[in-house]
A protein has these predicted regions:
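Non-catalytic pre-domain segments flanking phosphatase-related domains
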Residues: 6-54, 70-77, 101-102
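Mg2+-dependent phosphoryl-transfer enzymes with acidic/Ser/Thr/Gly-rich catalytic loops
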Residues: 30-36, 41-51, 67-68, 227-229, ...
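An N-terminally biased module of ancient metal coordination in phosphate/nucleic-acid-related enzymes
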Residues: 62-63
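Active-site phosphate-binding/coordination module
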Residues: 66-165
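Conserved acidic, metal-coordinating active-site core of Asp-based
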Residues: 157, 161-252, 263
Length: 296
């Protein structure tokens, strides 16, 4: 079995994964190694799965771009077979334009779960429209402190540039996001800006030291996110599992930033069946396999 590996973990223990990671506690798995999409055992991955969860940017689509036709097709088919979630650091409006607006006629919206701003907000389809189930918003004081600390430290570190494409600091209510090049910068520029994640880590550490009551973490290729402490993708998958009455170990989580420190990695630590992709093309091929596995 090629799920996240723990010492002594074998294919025969796949069924026990449904008990790993409590939806009520804070139990995590140590020493998680997340397999690539082309190294997973599809049959084992699908066995007992209750939900397929995805990161958005560079997993379902390029940053800020809508899903392409091939992705929209397989994603929509998946919602007709199993519950599907999208958990992203982006705001709700981006989920609408990148995912919801691209759904095909085969999609079952009632089985789709939208969790923007790293899962601090949760939306469900009620048959007529998308409704907010919960929101864990920052206070006015917390938002002000986060914005001030981000700008000041970014300036001190030389990464507050004279020109930016779009907003540099975006207030998403439940999350404050700093984008070094601006929210609307080309994806190629974002990906080239900090290939080793050193700049994001340095800014994250400086701001976190000033705001110990908040959770400060690297976001996408050129961003840093701030939310209430404990509200990352591990919280999101536990909260979703609890809402749906399933164990976290029945959730398959697919993302591109599955290395320690990556914003998808907390979902692996929470006990999901985590899988790493390097881009939407990988995700399409993985989904083809999952659809075949679920259809048997």
């Amino acid at each position: 079995c090629m799920f996240p590996t723990i010492s002594g973990f074998t294919r025969e223990t796949c069924d026990t994964m449904v008990g790993i990671g409590s939806t009520k506690g804070r139990t995590i798995m140590p020493d998680v190694s997340v397999p690539r999409w082309d190294a997973v055992d599809i049959e084992a991955l699908c066995k007992g799965a209750g939900l397929i969860a995805f990161d958005l940017d560079n997993t379902l689509a390029r940053s800020k771009k809508p899903m392409k036709d091939d992705m929209a097709k397989v994603f929509s088919v998946l919602t007709s077979l199993i519950d599907v979630a999208v958990i992203t650091g982006g705001k709700y409006a981006l989920l609408q334009s990148q995912v919801v607006d691209r759904l095909t006629g085969t999609a079952n919206r009632s089985r789709l779960h939208l969790m923007p701003t790293s899962g601090t907000r949760y939306y469900r389809w009620n048959g007529r429209r998308w409704t907010l189930v919960f929101a864990h918003d920052l206070s006015d004081e917390e938002r002000a402190k986060a914005k001030e600390a981000l700008e000041r430290n970014a300036r001190e570190q030389g990464i507050w540039y004279s020109h930016a494409c779009g907003e540099r600091i975006e207030d998403r209510g439940s999350q404050i996001t700093f984008s070094a090049l601006g929210q609307l910068a080309p994806i190629e520029a974002k990906e080239a800006w900090d290939p080793t994640d050193e700049k994001k880590r340095r800014l994250t550490q400086a701001v976190a030291a000033e705001l110990p009551e908040l959770d400060v973490r690297p976001g996408g290729a050129s961003s840093v996110d701030i939310s209430q402490r404990g509200f990352d993708k591990s919280f999101a998958v536990r909260e979703l599992a609890g809402t749906l009455g399933m164990e976290v170990g029945r959730i398959v989580f697919i993302g591109d930033r599955m290395e320690p420190g990556g914003n998808d990695y907390p979902a692996a630590l929470a006990g999901t069946r985590a899988v790493k992709v390097t881009g939407p093309a990988d995700t399409v091929r993985l989904c083809d396999g999952i659809i075949a596995g679920l259809s048997r």
